[in-house]
């Protein structure tokens, strides 16, 4: 299967730079599957995960807080606000942040608006999904 170059960068650092067989992400209009030879595309990406299929058919997961995805003939670039490899996520920290976000929504915290609270919860759920998918992929390798 043909490959293409994928670059994933966040505001702080380069997260990924290498040849891949494909990626899956959530764009502003829905789910995207990108393989070599995909038509050029520029789209906003929603908070969630990017699932990468590497040259050796192993998979890697990266949490993205949002950003942009650009497809060119031989290169795909993801510009993310925040990007964290699934293997670098801390489950306990995510669960604690999720619990606090849920608690703030239920209690109607007066210092934040509802949309911000729901957005925070959504980001924590996406991180948890990235962590769990990475964990499953790691167990499958064993």
From Swiss-Prot:
Membrane topology is: Peripheral membrane protein
Q: Supply one GO CC term from the record.
A: proton-transporting ATP synthase complex
Question: Which Gene3D superfamilies does the annotation name?
Answer: ATP synthase delta/epsilon subunit, C-terminal domain, F0F1 ATP synthase delta/epsilon subunit, N-terminal
| Location of the protein in the cell | Cell inner membrane
Q: Any idea which UniProt keywords this protein has?
A: ATP synthesis, Cell inner membrane, Cell membrane, CF(1), Hydrogen ion transport, Ion transport, Membrane, Transport
Mind listing the GO molecular function terms for this protein? Answer: ATP binding; proton-transporting ATP synthase activity, rotational mechanism
Q: Which InterPro entries match?
A: ATP_F1_dsu/esu_C_sf (IPR036794), ATP_synth_F1_dsu/esu (IPR001469), ATP_synth_F1_dsu/esu_N (IPR020546), ATPsynth_dsu/esu_N (IPR036771)
CDD domains under this entry?
F1-ATPase_delta
One Pfam family name is ATP-synt_DE_N
Family to which this protein belongs = Belongs to the ATPase epsilon chain family.
Its quaternary structure?
Answer: F-type ATPases have 2 components, CF(1) - the catalytic core - and CF(0) - the membrane proton channel. CF(1) has five subunits: alpha(3), beta(3), gamma(1), delta(1), epsilon(1). CF(0) has three main subunits: a, b and c.
Job description of the protein: Produces ATP from ADP in the presence of a proton gradient across the membrane.
Give the protein name, as stated in the record.
ATP synthase epsilon chain
Q: Which gene encodes it?
A: atpC
């Amino acid at each position: 299967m043909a490959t293409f170059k994928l670059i994933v960068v966040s505001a702080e650092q380069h997260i990924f730079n290498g040849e891949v067989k494909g990626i899956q992400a959530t764009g502003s209009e829905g789910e995207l599957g990108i393989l070599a030879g995909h038509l050029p595309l520029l789209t906003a990406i929603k908070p969630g995960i990017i699932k990468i299929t590497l040259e050796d058919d192993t998979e890697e997961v990266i949490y993205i807080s949002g950003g942009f995805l650009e497809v060119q003939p031989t290169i795909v670039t993801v510009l993310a606000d925040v990007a964290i490899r699934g293997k670098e996520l801390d489950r306990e920290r995510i669960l604690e942040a999720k619990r606090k976000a849920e608690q703030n929504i239920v209690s109607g915290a007066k210092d934040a608006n509802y949309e911000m609270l729901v957005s925070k919860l959504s980001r924590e759920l996406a991180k948890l999904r990235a962590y769990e998918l990475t964990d499953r992929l790691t167990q499958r390798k064993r």
